Amino acid sequence: MRVLVIGSGAREHALLLALSRDPQVKGLVVAPGNAGTARLAEQYDVDISSGEDIVALARDVRADMVVIGPELPLVLGVADAVRAAGIVCFGPSKDAARIEGSKAFAKEVMAAAGVRTSRSEIVNSPARLDAALDRFGPPVGDLSWVVKDDRLAAGKGVVVTSDRDVARTHAAGLLEAGHPVLLESYLDGPEVSLFCVVDGRTVLPLLPAQDFKRVGEGDTGPNTGGMGAYAPLPWLPDEVCQQALTSIVEPVAAELVQRGSPFRGLLYVGLAVTASGPAVVEFNCRFGDPETQVVLALLDSPLGQLLYAAGTGSLADFGELHWRSGAAVAVVLAAENYPRRPRVGDIVFGSEIEGVLHAGTTRRDDGVIVSSGGRVLSVVATGDDLSAARSQAYRIIGSIRLLGSHFRKDIGFSAAKGRIHI
């Protein structure tokens, strides 16, 4: 099997690495890729938002399956174009990808499916903003206001704050840009990222993970695309994941089938584990980054065959997933000034050692690897337990040099110390 992976981040590097371990995968292609993925796959620079260009590339490289990593091509309908060309695709249709592309649509689907989530309201007009803010946050007993961009925002469109002025400024800025605003009640509890492989009707959950969205230690500063992750979650009872599967993911998948938009791909549910059980924070239509890096590091089943089964509607016949023992930790090395406009073009030293997955990197004509984005690298390590995996990840990242770079030093710390309780 020849597999074409679409994307250029550490998530795609992790996908390629896991696919390379599948004995049935005989060839790997990536578009556009980065300086690290070039060691695993043929690379092509194409417009990944163009279904026509992706189909042409898939035909040229004789791909048996296309795996779409980022959300934007999915929301734009690239998976539809690939399937229409008769090529197996892992990734939802444009209609099904609305579960991430529009938070209002996701809320509508959850309501129809009877899924537990936060109370919410869409604000389309600045004139309605102040009254809407009065119905959320501390005025009604919530710890914080939760203000979200209804559209795609690369993980950076959310503000959670107890300061009304901060909430209002963020919401007003979104409205001024022409983006609807979603206000939500605050869900109190540790968060979980649960990935589920779905072929339309059959749902197969992967290991739960936890990511770290804020840029600063102690969950401070603005939101990012993700600064680190770990798996599995020693503090999470198995029954919570089972409850999430049967009361959240399966009903949502069934509702999408009912609407004529069956979901075929990776359905990612972000959960808050509250005192009353799991509740949905968000849905995404693709593998999350950096959680993918830790989940796939522990996967012992053949990834290519798993994704192909989902893409061909035969997931029910795949069988039980197998996992390696131990734990995995990913720590993101970010460029100076990230998550604002990052500094780029600096030489990255030590990026070609084992455990380093590339994201915002490119290779100059002289062969030197330089930074090209905000999240530059993901350092991934495994160990017998979370503490061992953390130690190894931080040992590796300590050997990498990039001018002005930064990373969080507390990824997985509370879990390793047994300080997370539900």
Swiss-Prot record:
GO biological process: 'de novo' IMP biosynthetic process; purine nucleobase biosynthetic process
Top-level class of the enzyme under EC nomenclature: ligase
Binding-site residues for ATP, renumbered to this chain: 138-193
Annotated pathway: Purine metabolism; IMP biosynthesis via de novo pathway; N(1)-(5-phospho-D-ribosyl)glycinamide from 5-phospho-alpha-D-ribose 1-diphosphate: step 2/2
Free-text comment on the cofactor: Binds 1 Mg(2+) or Mn(2+) ion per subunit.
Domain of life the protein comes from: Bacteria
Positions with a binding annotation for Mg(2+): E282, N284
Keyword Membrane: no
Name the record gives this protein: Phosphoribosylamine--glycine ligase
Species for this entry: Mycobacterium leprae (strain TN)
